[in-house]
Amino acid sequence: IGFLHSLGTNDKKIKSVFIVGGGLITFYLARLLVDSGISVTIIEKNPERCNMLCEKIPEALVICGDGTDKDLLDAEGLAYTGAMIALTDMDEENLIISMYAAYRGVQRVITKINRLEYASVIRQAGIDRVISPKYIAANEIVRYVRSMESLGGGDIKTLYRIIGQQAEMLEFVATPLTRHLGVPLSELPLKDN
């Protein structure tokens, strides 16, 4: 919801949004934007993904094409949209798309990156907002854990700050109510990586 509020600039409500990339974030974001009365245009390369987005979000205009193609972006009215959000899986593509949108005078330009070392370069290029799903998720987890600690609801023993304050490590105390108590780590149902 805070993300939607950030689309407003100087009391001018954004009425249209371009999203380049048709992944899961786009799916949920486009649904929120459409439900908020914002016109959404999605550009995605994968035809199957385009079909799915057309079926699930019929209110959005879904264009099957290359979001790095400036001729396509111009033909679809990029310069006249209120905001452009680059959500492809490639940081470099997102950077190029966002720089082009800023060059074309788009009011709000938001770029998704996975490698935070690009954040300063992107900001220097005149791009409004940089988002990192991994960083956002990590912050939400830390916020949740800290709230558990402050409410006395968790069994957090120690919070360590490591790697020059760039990472946090939590030490928990296992109680009889702890899920998977006594189960070796090798047998826990963990996701890869």
Regions found by a protein language model. Give the residues of each.
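Cytosolic regulatory regions of ion transport systems
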Residues: 1-193
